């Protein structure tokens, strides 16, 4: 990924050799939220902008001291029953509430985990891509497989620093079970993209009717794939010249999700034209963060769905993947201004056309990480049509792909699920959840 600097109209003053001179402000160009620094999103004009109005940043633990989270955590209300006493004496604070679908009495916490730079963790291999970013934490030695196939990491504490991120990948969902306090100032991301499967993102076969179906083939113009469903329904795939678009993935019954740890469903592939149809976007993964003490979030915890691929010549665009699951539970939950907990759907891919030199449709955007706005569908090539937007914010359903005389656009993926649970909760007005979610008691 390369960032380009572009000059903006604003002017700031710089002091050079004792003299005050004017210099242009700069902003980073972007194609999506992942291209921007923390606490910024990809805004109008494809430039990185602040996600929320600036607010005082909470104190951050000092790097290089894993295991000191209880002392460095800037939580408030230590005299209000925060079960963090005794950490210095080798005791693990017990949970004063029952975390969802977790038998915490069977888990023994290991050392604290500190994420100090950008890396990823694979629930299949149980390894960090860059072990140095995890400050020497041996996840493979402490990981536990739960009865539902979830990989759990029992921890004494957790810190994700503001200039660090942890991408969560692999076939199995992940549960971070913290017997103590946790601070997330950087990013925890279980989302999917065209290159990465988020941890626990299910296969088409696992999703059943909640997966988008494939568009019909037609060398004169194929149908787009349907968007994946999860908390809501995906978008319809757009029709091609004489080919129907794929059906959207259905919303899952929320009653069946009360304790399950599972991700969002994939979009259907676009039908084949003269060229191939676009691939369906993967659904977001499943992340469960349970903290016995105080959890303070000023960064990002997310599980967006992946965007659908653009169709080849006269091929249909792929449907976007649905957002996944972000379940956060704590004794005391604090969401600071600038915090973002998101599970947005991916945009559908654009349809292809064989009349233009650039015959491929564009890929749909992945679900937004730090905003409640819809991921854009990919543009269609030439006379072909674009994909539908992903579900986000108060619009949880994916938008339908457009019909076309060439390749139809893929439907957008639905939004996923955010769960916030706390014995006590502090949610700042500048904190964001998408889809919108309120904190509830256990």
Residue map of PLM features:
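Disulfide-rich extracellular modules and peptides
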Residues: 22, 32, 37-38, 44, ...
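Ser/Thr-rich, Pro/Gly/Ala-heavy low-complexity intrinsically disordered linkers and tails
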Residues: 20-106
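Enriched but not universal
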Residues: 77-79, 86-91, 429-442
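Glycine-centric low-complexity/flexibility signal
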Residues: 94-152, 172-175, 181-417
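Beta-strand repeat architectures
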Residues: 143-146, 163-172, 436
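Sec-dependent bacterial lipoprotein signal peptides
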Residues: 1-18
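Small-residue (G/S/T/A) turn/hinge positions that recur once per unit in extracellular repeat modules
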Residues: 163-165, 186-188, 299, 339-340, ...
């Amino acid at each position: 990924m390369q960032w380009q600097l572009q000059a903006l109209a604003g002017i700031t003053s710089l002091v050079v050799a004792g003299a005050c001179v004017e210099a242009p402000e700069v902003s980073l160009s972007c194609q999506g939220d992942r291209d921007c620094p923390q606490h910024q999103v990809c805004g109008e004009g494809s430039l990185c902008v602040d996600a929320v109005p600036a607010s005082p940043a909470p104190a951050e633990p000092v790097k290089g001291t894993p295991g000191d989270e209880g002392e460095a955590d800037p939580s408030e209300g230590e005299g209000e029953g925060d079960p963090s006493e005794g950490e210095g004496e080798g005791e693990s604070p017990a949970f004063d509430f029952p975390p969802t679908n977790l038998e915490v009495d069977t888990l023994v916490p290991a050392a604290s985990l500190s994420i100090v730079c950008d890396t990823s963790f694979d629930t299949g291999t149980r390894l960090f891509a860059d072990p140095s970013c995890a400050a020497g934490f041996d996840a493979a030695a402490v990981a536990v497989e739960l009865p539902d196939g979830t990989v759990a990491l029992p921890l004494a504490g957790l810190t994700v620093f503001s200039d660090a991120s942890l991408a969560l990948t692999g076939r199995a969902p992940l549960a971070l079970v913290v017997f103590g306090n946790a601070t997330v100032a950087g990013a925890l991301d279980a989302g999917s993209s065209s290159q990465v499967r988020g941890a626990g993102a299910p296969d088409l076969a696992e999703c059943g009717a909640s997966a988008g179906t494939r568009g019909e083939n037609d060398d004169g113009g194929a149908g787009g794939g349907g968007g994946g469903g999860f908390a809501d329904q995906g978008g319809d795939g757009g029709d091609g010249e004489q080919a129907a678009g794929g059906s959207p993935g259905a919303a899952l019954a929320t009653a069946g999700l009360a304790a399950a740890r599972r991700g969002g469903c994939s979009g259907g592939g676009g039908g084949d034209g003269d060229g191939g149809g676009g691939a369906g976007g993967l659904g977001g993964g499943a992340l469960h963060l349970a903290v016995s003490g105080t959890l303070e979030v000023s960064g990002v915890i997310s599980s967006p769905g992946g965007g659908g691929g653009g169709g080849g010549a006269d091929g249909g665009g792929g449907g976007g993947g649905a957002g996944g699951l972000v379940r956060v539970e704590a004794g005391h939950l604090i969401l600071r201004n600038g915090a973002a907990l998101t599970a947005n759907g991916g945009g559908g891919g654009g349809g292809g056309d064989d009349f233009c030199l650039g015959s491929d449709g564009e890929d749909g955007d992945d679900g937004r990480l730090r905003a409640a706005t819809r991921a854009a569908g990919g543009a269609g090539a030439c006379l072909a049509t674009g994909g539908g937007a992903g579900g986000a914010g108060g619009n949880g359903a994916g938008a339908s792909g457009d019909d076309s005389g060439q390749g139809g656009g893929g439907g957008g993926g639905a939004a996923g699920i955010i769960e916030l649970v706390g014995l006590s909760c502090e949610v700042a007005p500048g904190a964001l959840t998408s889809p919108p979610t309120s904190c509830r008691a256990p």
